[in-house]
């Protein structure tokens, strides 16, 4: 089965079995909602077990979650440093114009049919996502995911067409 990374357990939270998660999920509110099914992977990326979320809340930059049948710090302390993943089957459907991060990362980025580079990472600094584009012989390009910049995303062909606004590329 194929799994996709959605977060890392960085610490426990209190004594009642809550965990502090650093999310890398594209849809954290959906991914960590009550009843969601996730998989735990250890620090060597080996599958450990399936888990069900029974509670979720945000606290600063972390998602605080609790798993079914794990209601005390002693039951969860061993999971610090483990990764949470979602199976492909549990990802859910997307609206038109929405994409999973794993679909975008690795895509070729073009401006006027000239290859700029490939998306290597997606950041979530605030109002919109920022795609980090790795370029040959240049510094990475930070590309805001907004309509005037990202013109077309072709998932089947792994291609993104963009129009770089003035000031986006400081190496030109």
Swiss-Prot record:
InterPro entries: PRC-brl_dom, PRC_barrel-like_sf, RimM, RimM_N, RimM_N_sf, Transl_B-barrel_sf. It comes from the Bacteria. Keywords: Chaperone, Cytoplasm, Ribosome biogenesis, rRNA processing. One of its GO terms (molecular function) is ribosome binding. GO terms for biological process: ribosomal small subunit biogenesis; rRNA processing. It is found in: Cytoplasm. GO terms for cellular component: cytoplasm; ribosome. The keyword Cytoplasm applies. The keyword Magnesium does not apply. Residues 96-168 form the PRC barrel domain. An accessory protein needed during the final step in the assembly of 30S ribosomal subunit, possibly for assembly of the head region. Essential for efficient processing of 16S rRNA. May be needed both before and after RbfA during the maturation of 16S rRNA. It has affinity for free ribosomal 30S subunits but not for 70S ribosomes. The PRC barrel domain binds ribosomal protein uS19. Belongs to the RimM family. Binds ribosomal protein uS19. This is Ribosome maturation factor RimM. The lineage of its organism: Bacteria, Bacillati, Bacillota, Bacilli, Lactobacillales.
């Amino acid at each position: 089965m194929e799994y996709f990374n959605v977060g890392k357990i960085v610490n426990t939270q209190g004594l009642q079995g809550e965990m502090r998660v650093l999310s890398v999920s594209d849809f954290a509110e959906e991914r960590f909602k009550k009843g969601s099914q996730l998989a735990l992977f250890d620090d060597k990326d080996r599958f450990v077990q399936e888990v069900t979320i029974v509670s979720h809340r945000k606290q600063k930059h972390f998602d605080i979650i609790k798993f079914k049948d794990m209601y005390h710090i002693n039951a969860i302390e061993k999971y610090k440093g483990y990764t949470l993943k979602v199976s492909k089957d549990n990802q859910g459907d997307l609206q038109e114009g929405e994409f999973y991060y794993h679909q975008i990362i690795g895509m070729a980025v073009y401006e006027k049919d000239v290859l700029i580079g490939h998306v290597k990472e997606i950041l979530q600094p605030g109002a919109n996502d920022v795609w980090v584009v790795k370029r040959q012989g240049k510094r990475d390009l930070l590309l805001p995911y907004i309509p005037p910049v990202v013109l077309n995303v072709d998932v089947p062909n792994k291609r993104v067409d963009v129009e770089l606004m003035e000031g986006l590329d400081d190496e030109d």
